[in-house]
Amino acid sequence: MLISELLQTPLGIFFVGLFSLMVGSFLNVVIYRVPVMMDREEKQYAWQVFHGEDSVCPEIPKQRFNLLVPASRCPHCGHRIRAIENIPVISWLFLKGKCSGCGAAISARYLLVELLTAALSVIVAFHYHDPLSLGFALVFTWTLIALCFIDAEHQLLPDRLTLPLLWLGILAALFNVFINLESSVIGAMIGYLSLWSVYWLFKLITGREGMGYGDFKLLACLCAWQGAWMLPIILFSAAILGMIYALGIGLRMGKPMPFGPFLAIAGWLTFLYGAQIGQLFGYFPA
């Protein structure tokens, strides 16, 4: 009860935002390292197929590389990032977006992820005051942020993020946090099969692939958290966001944008404002 009351005060919201800044810093590690880890695993697997299970690909560095080790370094000069240089937001601004070792530019994405994580977490904290609901909702939000940026940069929606998010949604439903267990499981199934069907229909007609399997899994995750009845709203919202991007930024850049980020954004908006969006589209009665 005391925690619930604290979460409704400005001080509680402030602490959520402050903690989320640190989470945003970790999400930057996830966004950078998970694709590298996947690439190394694929190279090692391909090498073992041709050279035996006990062989080691010489292109892969021998040093351990995961989300915890080694310590963060500048990708340009290898300068080790000191603790004082790793303070969320402040360090990037103090260093003026440059490495203290070589002066190379540090991507503004690091600053954006930290600020975005804090901002979205504060919004979530305004919606959910119950500690259990808030905890689940924050993890949902943080995972979508990581997936959004990874897919935008690498056209990847890693199983090591989508599958835990799917099971976490089902776990939340087991305790009736957002929806019940039956709705969660059915939602996951329908969410996956809907895009899977579109994928194969498009491929049969055109002979080309219109999206990746990661999109199926991401939509399954979103529906596991919200139920199958939110599927039309999520897809329609994602399509609108994609069209806005294509007509605006996409045409100028001449670069295709994966569907995952639009699904993630639409899924998060629907998670918090699904009823309002549904009324706007006439899906739910006002």
UniProtKB/Swiss-Prot annotation:
EC number assigned by the record: 3.4.23.43, 2.1.1.-
GO biological process, one term: signal peptide processing
Function: Plays an essential role in type IV pili and type II pseudopili formation by proteolytically removing the leader sequence from substrate proteins and subsequently monomethylating the alpha-amino group of the newly exposed N-terminal phenylalanine.
Main subcellular location: membrane
Protein keywords: Cell inner membrane, Cell membrane, Hydrolase, Membrane, Metal-binding, Methyltransferase, Multifunctional enzyme, Protease, S-adenosyl-L-methionine, Transferase, Transmembrane, Transmembrane helix, Zinc
Cofactor details (free text): Zinc is required for the N-terminal methylation of the mature pilin, but not for signal peptide cleavage.
Domain of life: Bacteria
Listed name of the protein: Prepilin leader peptidase/N-methyltransferase
TM spans (from-to): 11-31, 106-126, 132-152, 161-181, 185-205, 231-251, 257-277
Localization of this protein: Cell inner membrane
Positions bound to Zn(2+): 74, 77, 99, 102
Cofactor(s) recorded in Swiss-Prot or TrEMBL: Zn(2+)
Family (UniProt): Belongs to the peptidase A24 family.
